[in-house]
A protein has these predicted regions:
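N-terminal active-site segment of His-dependent metallophosphoesterases
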Residues: 23-96
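Solvent-exposed loop/turn segments at secondary-structure junctions
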Residues: 51-54, 87-90, 118-123, 170-174, ...
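Short, flexible/disordered intra-domain loops and linkers
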Residues: 56-60, 124-132, 214-225, 256
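Gram-positive cell-envelope targeting signals
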Residues: 1-24
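A short C-terminal boundary segment appended to hydrolase-like catalytic domains
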Residues: 29-31, 36-39, 289, 293-328
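Active-site neighborhood of phospho(di)ester-bond hydrolases with catalytic His/Asp-centered motifs
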Residues: 47-49, 81-86, 112-118, 204-206, ...
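Extended active-site neighborhood of metal-dependent phosphoesterases/phosphodiesterases
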Residues: 93-196, 231, 237-238, 254-283, ...
């Protein structure tokens, strides 16, 4: 009962802070205070989704830059910035370039793990979808701070020894329903198999969630991977300590209140795979913290992966919505 009450109080206080960000009384409440990062953090990553940059809406560019400025001020080193898709609103080249340039100028993380979303591929109207994917690759290669080069919009990378695999819509005539070629399935399987013997958690970043996880079927019936879902899940379930990070359905960060009322959570473990669904950074969310600016600070330790809820726009922590996932 107290946990549910804290959830409600946290929502009210956080809403007031968006209106009165400099209130000393509100900022002093224990419910939003930051617990110090524990000793022994092996990987520290900021994870967000659905940024929806549009050069015709400059306030959105400012909101993105403001959140990255919060990361830049972090007293703890941020090893990676992870964005799980919908980097832009309409997939136009100018907005994609703006998204990347804002990150490049912020110097907020040593590594980037960036996935394309349906708004970056499926919603492209002024050029072929493959051209949009190649422009994404070129910007990543030219600007990412680690200097790493990728050949395709789906790729793998290692950060502090941890394997990350990024997936993408391979289709040429898709909108909101992604398509994946056989080559990409094989790439996912091989990339996880290659790193599995390290005994470390592995992370798969894909904009669209697999079917039926994190409340996708209740929130947006057609908002999952569709025909690709079973194949992707069958690969994920072959390996231990896999974390699947998605966005797309604009679900707010939530906790016991939503889980008890609706039967799902933004962090779930199903058949041994850990599924994390992120809110939209730029737009209103449902079934959880509703406003934008939200994401997780993901801290990896020897025995757990800790997801600490944070509003990067208002520089506030939401400890009542933290999730700890044990490493098996």
């Amino acid at each position: 009962m107290w946990l549910a009450i804290k959830s409600v109080i946290s929502l009210v206080v956080s809403l007031l802070l968006t209106v009165f960000p400099n209130s000393a009384i509100l900022n002093g409440l224990d419910i939003l205070e930051l617990a110090e990062q524990k000793e022994g953090c092996l990987l520290n990553a900021s994870i967000v989704s659905d940024v929806h940059i549009d050069v015709d809406w400059p306030i959105g560019e400012w909101i993105w830059a403001n959140g990255l400025n919060d990361l830049e001020r972090s007293k703890d080193t941020i090893d990676a910035l992870i964005v799980s898709g919908d980097l832009t609103n309409y997939g136009d080249a100018a907005s994609m370039e703006s998204f990347y340039n804002i990150m490049y100028d912020s110097h907020c993380a040593d590594n980037w793990v960036i996935a394309m979303g349906n708004h970056d591929v499926g919603h492209v109207e002024d050029r072929p979808q493959e051209q949009a994917r190649q422009e994404f690759v070129e910007l990543y290669n030219n600007l990412n701070p680690a200097g790493e080069k990728i050949e395709k919009a789906y790729y793998k990378t290692d950060i502090n020894g941890y394997r990350f695999v990024v997936l993408v819509d391979d289709g040429e005539d898709t909108w909101d329903h992604p398509d994946m070629a056989e080559e990409q399935y094989q790439f996912l399987d091989a990339s996880l198999a290659e790193a599995a013997d390290r005994g470390l958690p592995m992370f798969v970043v894909c904009h669209v969630p697999v079917e039926g996880v994190n409340g996708q079927d209740k929130i947006w019936e057609d908002g999952g991977l569709g025909d690709c879902s079973d194949r992707v899940q069958s690969i994920l379930e072959k390996y231990e300590n896999v974390f699947f990070i998605s966005g797309h359905v604009h679900t707010g960060i939530n906790g016991p209140l939503v889980e008890n009322a609706f039967g799902f959570s933004c962090v779930e473990t199903i058949n041994g795979v850990n599924y994390i669904n992120l809110p939209t950074y730029m737009i209103i969310n449902r079934y959880g913290v509703p406003w934008g600016g939200m994401g997780f600070q993901m801290e990896v330790y020897e025995d757990e992966v800790l997801f600490r809820a944070r509003n990067y726009g208002s520089s506030k922590w939401y400890p009542v919505y933290d999730h700890s996932v044990p490493i098996v």
